[in-house]
Amino acid sequence: MTQQIDRYAVFGNPIEHSKSPFIHTLFARQTNQPLIYTAETAPKEGFVEAVKAFFAEGGKGCNVTLPFKEEAYQFASRLTERAQLAGAVNTLKKLDDGDIIGDNTDGAGLVQDLLQHQVVLAGARILVIGAGGAARGVLKPLLDQKPTSLTITNRTFSKAEELAVLFAAYGSVTAKEMNTVTEEYDVIINSTSASLSGELPALSSSIFAANSTSYDMMYGKGDTTFNQWAKQHGAAHAYDGLGMLVGQAAESFMLWRGLRPGSKQILRELRKNLEGL
């Protein structure tokens, strides 16, 4: 009798350009884990039905991307602490008792990538640009690294204020209006998607301290719009979100398989794939 190969997937809409199957196939090869990982388009109004069917047909776990992370949060029968704080789920796993646990590995992926680049977060002055789901998902893991301060700025100030209140118990968190952000920061994280449309947040270029690091969660061929601007105005280091993508995937893989794959080689392969080399 042939053994059933464990099935995993990523659900989103659109999903055609997802790098997750590429990443997880390499993880599986690296760790000698027999599994299949596919990209699945869920209808905009049919995410829950699609995921239920996937698990009913024997699926073991899945990643969830836009626009379904909040729905996945509602769907999960149990949540990790970091998923509860993120208010969104990017990883689902079916447990032996049939329950579906929801996790959010985005923040862990970001922190892992920053630390791999030797970015010092302990004692740092961190600025997070944006106050949407991407920002909310990474605040707790960033605060766990014990920065001196974490400032959130956003076009709609009230959203930044809401996040500052929500995470106040976990460290020194403040919200600032964009036009009042003039002091220097050690680590500047752009959680907005502005770079995808070639736009920049309305911020002063005085935010980059000596030896500062710019991190844009978006990625593409070459530097993002935000990182180009950061380097022009004094950022000593600039990284895009491709390493975060690999890091959050490694964290998901760990949740599913109990093994942590190595990220460095996979990131190199993914970068080559992205550049069309």
Curated annotation (Swiss-Prot):
Active site feature: K69
The enzyme's E.C. designation: 1.1.1.25
One GO biological process term: aromatic amino acid family biosynthetic process
Entry GO CC: cytosol
Short name of one Pfam family: SDH_C
Pathway: Metabolic intermediate biosynthesis; chorismate biosynthesis; chorismate from D-erythrose 4-phosphate and phosphoenolpyruvate: step 4/7
Catalytic activity field: shikimate + NADP(+) = 3-dehydroshikimate + NADPH + H(+)
GO terms of molecular function: NADP binding; shikimate 3-dehydrogenase (NADP+) activity
Main EC class the enzyme belongs to: oxidoreductase
Sequence positions that bind shikimate: S18, K19, S20, T65, N90, D106, Y219
Keyword Secreted: no
Keywords recorded for this protein, A-Z: Amino-acid biosynthesis, Aromatic amino acid biosynthesis, NADP, Oxidoreductase
Annotated positions binding NADP(+): E81, G130, A131, G132, G133, A134, N154, R155, T156, F157, S158, K159, M217, G241
Free-text function comment from the UniProt entry: Involved in the biosynthesis of the chorismate, which leads to the biosynthesis of aromatic amino acids. Catalyzes the reversible NADPH linked reduction of 3-dehydroshikimate (DHSA) to yield shikimate (SA).
PANTHER family, sorted: BIFUNCTIONAL 3-DEHYDROQUINATE DEHYDRATASE_SHIKIMATE DEHYDROGENASE, CHLOROPLASTIC, SHIKIMATE DEHYDROGENASE
Family the entry assigns: Belongs to the shikimate dehydrogenase family.
Complex formation: Homodimer.
Protein name listed in UniProt: Shikimate dehydrogenase (NADP(+))
Organism: Vibrio vulnificus (strain YJ016)
